[in-house]
């Protein structure tokens, strides 16, 4: 499975937060006013959009995305997307790759919180992305300021046309109130609400991929840094899904063979106050949760006895020495 190409011009929210519209996490396009030329499901495909010259089907040119017919009677088209998890949307990427003479001139996005069902005609929608001008074969990145959690989106295109991909970056919201305080939870799982605060280098793959569910599908499905030609090491800071006491750690180098990290260590702290941007410097001085451990290629490494008891922590700094790649990081712990 191909992974989306890193866009150096993409805003930070595309690297920091998971894509809540990822079908691998459970997202689904549930309704569209029209999908004559291309089905709505393609718009959520986690792989980059492709163009296949000369490929046609019964409806015309095959396009990798959602595409509606030409409207002749006024109005506009829309598609309903159920997010993989209820979450606070931080930003969106409306991608029109390969749509040139058939992209919508504009789009907007509305949202609703419907934990127990699907939208109806009576659903009250909140606009989170105002009508935004689109260009063909390009990405429209739009930051979202709302702090409310949503479960569904309504993507409006004016008046018709095609969108190759929709990415909805945000922080999943999990209700921890009734959770078992004796059960181990993966506090580094993005589906539980963990996210990458900052990483010093993400040349070949964003650190957020380490927090994805399941094992990596190939070498592109993980965090990989450039080759380090100077002293030091690579690192990333992760905000845990919930404050907790770490009991078990997994570092998975699946598919990384000639480029896996030689060694790793983890520092941790209970952070009170401050902002995400202030953690970069603080993290250098956090206590050691897991001392340096030698890694092997293409292997799941598990640690329990090696973990220091630091009590309840909220953030970790994951260090790779000196550079390289790691596919997945799991931090199982009991919550506060």
Swiss-Prot record:
Taxonomic superkingdom: Bacteria
Pathway in which this enzyme or protein is active: Nitrogen metabolism; (S)-allantoin degradation; (S)-ureidoglycolate from allantoate (aminidohydrolase route): step 1/1
GO biological process, one term: purine nucleobase metabolic process
Broad EC category: hydrolase
Signal peptide location: none
Record's keyword terms, sorted: Hydrolase, Purine metabolism
Official protein name in the record: Probable allantoicase
């Amino acid at each position: 499975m191909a992974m989306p190409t890193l866009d150096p011009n993409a805003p930070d929210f595309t690297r920091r937060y998971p894509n809540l519209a990822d079908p691998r996490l459970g997202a689904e396009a549930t309704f569209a006013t029209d999908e004559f030329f291309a089905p709505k499901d393609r718009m959520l495909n986690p792989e980059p959009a492709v163009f296949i010259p000369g490929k046609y089907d019964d409806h015309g040119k095959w396009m990798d995305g959602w595409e509606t017919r030409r409207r002749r009677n006024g109005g506009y088209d829309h598609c309903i997307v159920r997010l993989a998890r209820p979450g606070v949307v931080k930003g969106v990427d409306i991608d029109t790759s390969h749509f040139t003479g058939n992209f919508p001139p504009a789009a907007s996005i509305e949202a609703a919180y419907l934990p127990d069902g699907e939208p109806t005609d009576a659903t009250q929608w909140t606009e989170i992305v105002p009508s935004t001008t689109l260009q063909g074969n390009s990405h429209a990145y739009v930051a979202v300021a709302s702090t409310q959690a949503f479960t569904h989106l309504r993507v409006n295109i004016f008046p018709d046309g095609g969108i190759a991909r929709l990415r909805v970056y945000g922080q999943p919201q999990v209700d921890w109130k009734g959770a078992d305080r004796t059960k181990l939870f993966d506090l580094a799982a993005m589906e539980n609400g963990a996210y990458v605060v900052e990483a010093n280098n993400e040349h070949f793959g964003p650190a957020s991929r380490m927090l994805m569910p399941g094992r990596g599908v190939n070498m592109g499905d993980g965090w990989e840094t450039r080759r380090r030609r100077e002293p030091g090491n690579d690192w990333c800071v992760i905000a845990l899904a919930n404050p907790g006491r770490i009991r078990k750690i997994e570092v998975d180098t699946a598919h990384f063979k000639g480029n896996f990290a030689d060694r790793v260590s983890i520092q941790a702290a209970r952070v009170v106050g401050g902002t995400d941007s202030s953690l970069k410097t603080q993290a250098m001085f956090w206590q050691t949760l897991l001392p340096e451990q030698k890694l092997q290629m293409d292997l799941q490494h598990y640690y329990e006895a090696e973990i220091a008891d630091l009590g309840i922590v909220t953030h970790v700094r994951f260090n790779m020495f000196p550079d390289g790649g790691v596919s997945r990081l799991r931090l199982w712990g009991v919550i506060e």
